């Protein structure tokens, strides 16, 4: 089997020269024949259902449809590897080469690339220092442009002329044979290509640099004209740095992507379904062949120009359907998908297939609230956990001697034996998992949690981490990922664990805050409720005694009681008692609004009582324990 593995350091995207495009598609067969150019618009033969030669699915250019079998069937099997059939000219090799072998279409007339003409910045217009509308007029055969000027005439270089203007000037200018050699006027992509070829990049860059050092002083902000010059300077410098020629923005050769990336498949009823790109390529080849034929029979100029314009529009549709002119539609008036549509957007090749790849050791399920969980925990369904941690479970089963090999371990897992769950519980201890909710708009969109096995099929999530994920429980789904290596697990535990991410990276404010029933519970514990009087005004020797009395239903949660408290009271009323009582042993009792202090004759505190409720004592105890922890 051929090894297609290649190592590379980086990927560079740049303009491709016509020679480079030919190089992509051209191949030399073992018999010395060079193939690669597509000349026919046919796809497959309706009788034999085999690809047509020199067509869009040609086996000679792209390789055989069946492994190790030529087009005519003379050579079959692996033993004929590398042989080129003398009857059909197909090389005997694997069919998977049709996934990467390209071809090309040699155009009878140059056409501009619609991305560089009608993009957000028209690079062709910027490079030529023309307006976008002016370039469009030239490309689509509405106006002529002077590609070479002469001192004897009033025509300037890159000046646009309407058709009737050029007709009236043509006879006058070309009367003299000498002037005929000096002035040139062009139309269409050929004229644009000539103008781009004639650009002296070094000279233009030097001129623009001089202008950049002397910006206009009349305005505080740079003018639009100055900004355009700076944009042009950046573009010219990029051309110089990359070694690209501006004329490469005009096609003379069109690349054709491999046939297995634009397949044609037979449906049940005998009909065929084909990729939209094949229709675009077919239109281009038909128009290109017609243009070549018209040129060869010396057809009138107006007919040739019309055909060139149609070829330009066909190539525009292939690159970006609907960017300019009428959108090409297929059956049911559905716009056909062009190369741009395949690449761009959420469903495009980059976001869907390259950035959005499915990964191993991951799962997805609906989230439900788990109020019983700790902040660093999440509830993971047992089925999902067993599937995600299967390699770890198998390893542990073999280590414990419950099975001898992987096959036996997998059978044991399939049978759902009870010992599996004990092993799974051991495996997930201290092994964090990553939870992610799309869209991941900031770094808190993916956090680590310690999994707890739960019944059912829903992931349980702590309610306090919902603001960070922007999650709610109305059907939201979350993805689970298992960090495999020890480094990944350590990183997840140290950096990504939910309790370590309580500040918002955007504002620096806490993003984990008590909410909903927690706030209600805190309010209820600390609220005043005069109607609850059971055990009110009783004295207790310690705060713990109050909690015990409440648990035994001796006092109500909101009843005001007096409890001994040896800590420091931070209050403005400490200096101003309501009443002072002096006892026979010169000891003093000071009465305040919410506490009582008894002092001896030397003003040393003997005992202190505070007026509070069992609810507030419970609330204070919880806060104190969490701060100490």
From Swiss-Prot:
Disulfide bonds: none
Cofactor binding summary note: Binds 1 Mg(2+) ion per subunit. Binds 1 Zn(2+) ion per subunit.
GO molecular function: DNA binding; DNA-directed RNA polymerase activity; magnesium ion binding; zinc ion binding
Positions bound to Mg(2+): 472, 474, 476
Pfam families associated with the record: RNA_pol_Rpb1_1 (PF04997), RNA_pol_Rpb1_2 (PF00623), RNA_pol_Rpb1_3 (PF04983)
Compartment(s) where it occurs, according to its Swiss-Prot or TrEMBL record: Plastid, Chloroplast
Protein keywords: Chloroplast, DNA-directed RNA polymerase, Magnesium, Metal-binding, Nucleotidyltransferase, Plastid, Transcription, Transferase, Zinc
InterPro entries documented for this protein: DNA-dir_RpoC1_gamma, DNA-dir_RpoC_beta_prime, RNA_pol_asu, RNA_pol_N, RNA_pol_Rpb1_1, RNA_pol_Rpb1_3, RNA_pol_Rpb1_3_sf, RNA_pol_Rpb1_clamp_domain
Protein EC: 2.7.7.6
GO biological process, one term: DNA-templated transcription
GO-annotated cellular components: chloroplast; DNA-directed RNA polymerase complex; mitochondrion
Cofactor(s) required for function per UniProt: Mg(2+); Zn(2+)
Assembly and interaction partners: In plastids the minimal PEP RNA polymerase catalytic core is composed of four subunits: alpha, beta, beta', and beta''. When a (nuclear-encoded) sigma factor is associated with the core the holoenzyme is formed, which can initiate transcription.
Family named by the database record: Belongs to the RNA polymerase beta' chain family. RpoC1 subfamily.
NCBIfam families: PRK02625.1 (NF002729), rpoC1_cyan (TIGR02387)
Function (record text): DNA-dependent RNA polymerase catalyzes the transcription of DNA into RNA using the four ribonucleoside triphosphates as substrates.
Protein's recorded name: DNA-directed RNA polymerase subunit beta'
Species this chain originates from: Porphyra purpurea
